[in-house]
Amino acid sequence: DPLWSRGLGDVYKRQRLVYCSVTGFGQTGPRAAEPAYDFLIQAMGGLMSVTGERDDKPGGGPQKVGVPIVDLTTGVYAALGIVAALLRRSQTGQGEYIDVAMLDVQVGLLANQAMNFLLGGRVPRRTGTAHPNIQPQRTFACADGDIVIVVGNDAQFATPVSYTHLRAHETRED
């Protein structure tokens, strides 16, 4: 326990206390005492393996997310844990210790990739702006710049197709 190891074991006398610890790698294990940074966790946790352009495209290869997504998401998870603990305390009178590790949070962000692998045997890979499961859903180059098309089903796809004055069967053949 982080409080006990810092000589703050008396905190246990305060049964209503809610406290949260945020670390890079958790309280135990070979990296428990090591510092962590968003970029490092993205690389170690596999997020960069699915972020960026495909390897066969110019600029392909691992990329970090453009915002400190692990830092931000870890903060949200910690805050949610604290709010849940405060709610529990209001109902039971008991405090709580919340332990949030950045690596755990980042691996949790890969839930869809894990599902694709565990259920379908598909190894996650970088797809650029394309979605790994839903097509068409990506950036398309146009004469005057790029356009993003996002559709979730055939009915949604019919709308942009009608705007382009193409027949749906011609688009399917392309």
Residue ranges of each PLM-predicted region?
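Aromatic-enriched alpha-helical interface/lid elements that frame and gate functional surfaces
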Residues: 135-167, 172
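A short glycine-threonine-serine/GTX helix/turn-capping micro-motif
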Residues: 62-73, 95, 127-131, 135-137, ...
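The feature captures the short pre-catalytic strand/loop hairpin that immediately precedes
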Residues: 45-66
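Oxidoreductase and adenylate-handling cofactor-binding alpha/beta cores
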Residues: 75-95, 108-119, 161-163
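Single conserved hydrophobic/aromatic residue that forms the stacking wall/gate
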Residues: 1-12, 165-174
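N-terminal Rossmann-like NAD(P) cofactor-binding subdomain of oxidoreductases
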Residues: 13-52
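Flexible, acidic loop-helix segments that line cofactor/substrate-binding pockets
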Residues: 63, 96-98, 104, 167, ...
